[in-house]
């Protein structure tokens, strides 16, 4: 996904929701609007089988990533601080329907130079919801990203992300994903709704995770 740098932060408004504080803050992104993609997520019966099917279709194979996402309580959409390979850190906000069918997602990504400070500020203002730890294989089929994810406490998953240019209609992404889904033999029974954080909470795995130390990229 493209990366945008947050350039200004107006005064926040803090509200209390249930057990955590939530922060309402508009992020000024200069001339860069939120981007869009079309997404679909599925549980994989066999990671090896799916890998063997996607490799011949991929136009590019990117380096694998170890991603640790810390989700914060947010009044709208989902907000997470992501560390990639213990090096780069991004703050990601996104909003999408919780549907098992392909859906359009709006998202913003900001590079973070002070991850410890940002994590501390967001923890104090919002409260931590959950941590998601995963290994991700990344394949590109033109503008569609195919992620093969092994998620701690959950298992193996596939995620399609059809990245939409400003002039592209969402229907284009839906059609691209439908073609790839058929090629990879993804059935209706494999499809899931929500995000990994929702699955962890539903499984009760989030409560079993150890306390979260500050992020320290190495």
Locate predicted features.
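Mixed-charge, glycine-accented linear interaction segment located at domain edges/termini
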Residues: 168-192
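Intrinsic disorder/low-complexity segments
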Residues: 5-6
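Residues forming well-ordered secondary-structure scaffolds
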Residues: 35, 117, 134, 155, ...
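Conserved, surface-exposed functional patches that form binding/active-site neighborhoods
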Residues: 128, 132-166, 170
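N-terminal strand-loop-strand beta-hairpin
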Residues: 21-144, 184-218
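Intrinsically disordered, low-complexity terminal segments enriched in Ser/Thr
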Residues: 14-22
